[in-house]
Amino acid sequence: MTYKDPSLPTAARVDDLVARMTLQEKAGLLFHTISWFAPPPGAETAESMIDGRHMNHFNVLGGGSPREMAEWHNALQERAAATRLGIPVTLSTDPRHSFSGNPGASMMAGAFSQWPEPPGLAAIGSAELVRTFADMARQEYLAVGIRVALHPQIDLVTEPRWSRANGTFGQDAELTSRLVRAYILGFQGERLGPGSVACMTKHFPGGGPQKDGEDPHFAHGREQVYPGGRFEHHLKPFEAAFDAGTSQIMPYYGMPVGTEHEEVGFGFNKGVITGLLRERYAFDGIVCTDWGLITDAFIMGQEMPARAWGVEHLTPAERVLKAFEAGVDQFGGEACPDLLAEWVEAGRISTGRLDASVRRVLREKFTLGLFDAPFVDPDAAGEIVGRAAFARAGFEAQTASLTLLKNGPLPLAEGVRLYVEGVDAGLAAGYGKVVPAPEEADVAVLRLAAPYEPRPGAFEAFFHSGSLAFDAAEIDRITRLQRTVPTVVNVYLERPAVFPEIAEGAAAVVADYGASDRALLEVLFGRAEPKGRLPYELPRSMAAVEASPSDVPGGTRDPLYPFGHGLLS
């Protein structure tokens, strides 16, 4: 068969395979859904979707040891090879190299090397380091069979309350553009090929300007608003991604309000997908919707309506038609290829339109070498994933990303009497004498996380939204501690926290974006150098946040610390 001959050009192989495929096989190719490494009770398995729905794109949730993941991948490839045409599986993943775990956005590093979150890479600001990270992550992904990265996330943090800030490179379009080029080149290389991990860059055309900072995973966050008239500004990082050759694009859930575009979610929006992405930018890669636009679901026991914002009145079948007519190729987080096939059978979607998307998806599979070398080596996976050089580089990035916002006593002297909160006392004992009460200490070290308002539902609870300010009781507790002993305050900036009273009373303030206790202590005791600069400004008050336009970077009045602030030694 021509499509199985690796000596032939990719275009010829694609043409041959498309001609052999049934409608059901084509439709199955265009759905890219979740598969658990260890499925929860009642979840449909990847194997059943390969056999029964002709699907072969799976977003992996969870994980095991590198060997176990590689063996699981190989078993899926064996299952796919036994199908009529033997179309191989493509596995994808959300980020899994940092400190945050959110089943809708990212996973803890686990066996993989552990790095700061993307704002930490932005705080360092080195394109060379970002490319190094991406290249190391690429090698770890390849080792276990992951061939598509559901990242980078290059939205601009122009609304500080937005819960997805910690997946971005911060507020600045120029910095984000510089880093995304390096990121894509590290994962994909100069040209996509058998050694690449394809990037699904998101969320086109920029997911930062969320009304009140609410996220469009949920109905109350469905609107994206542009009071500052900056719609075009949010496109700049995507222009850099196109220049770097991103293989795929994911539109966001949100619907634009008050722009020239139809007020429907971006995945249904023909003016955005066809008009902007396909025609203005001439993007001919894969466009995959964000997850769950078509059907309702239960996620972690929480009822989640389809994110069909602006088209809630349409049936699931009608939503499939509208998204496909808008110009998407694949449906993320869905497993209903029958709905697409029915529109082709009814003549509403032409075979030519269907085949255009099928060709894009197959072209990537062939280019990645999946038809010619679908299996991975479980022994090699155990050696590559989390190897010492990768772990060391990740740790060094953690220390470098730490951002010194205010300093008095640093570096601390070895053997100093320490009172610690939020820091492993046993680990801290290797640096100083840990004491049980602040009154006995020479200095206190306090680790805090950016505040948020807890939300109902097990799934929504992972999306830290609402106020960025500490409550009055916590401020009072911390300022009393600061009056008792000189206090070094470390704040994890998953969002741009508001903490003027705490900063004023602190002897030193250090920001982090995902760093271990050891990384923090190495910096506090002068064994490593903090090199970070803020990737987004820190507002002085919630009133300033609420008054700032959601689409304008650095729009809060008189920030506590401006974008780019950082005391370097």
Regions found by a protein language model. Name each.
Residues 1-6, 12, 143, 263, ...:
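C-terminal non-catalytic regions of proteins with extracellular/luminal or membrane-system context
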Residues 33-34, 95-96, 155-156, 199-207, ...:
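A glycine-rich phosphate-binding loop feature that marks nucleotide/adenosyl-phosphate handling sites
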Residues 102-104, 212, 495-500:
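Distinct, well-ordered alpha-helical segments
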Residues 123-131, 227, 231, 387-394, ...:
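Short acidic-aromatic active-site loops that bind/stabilize oxyanions
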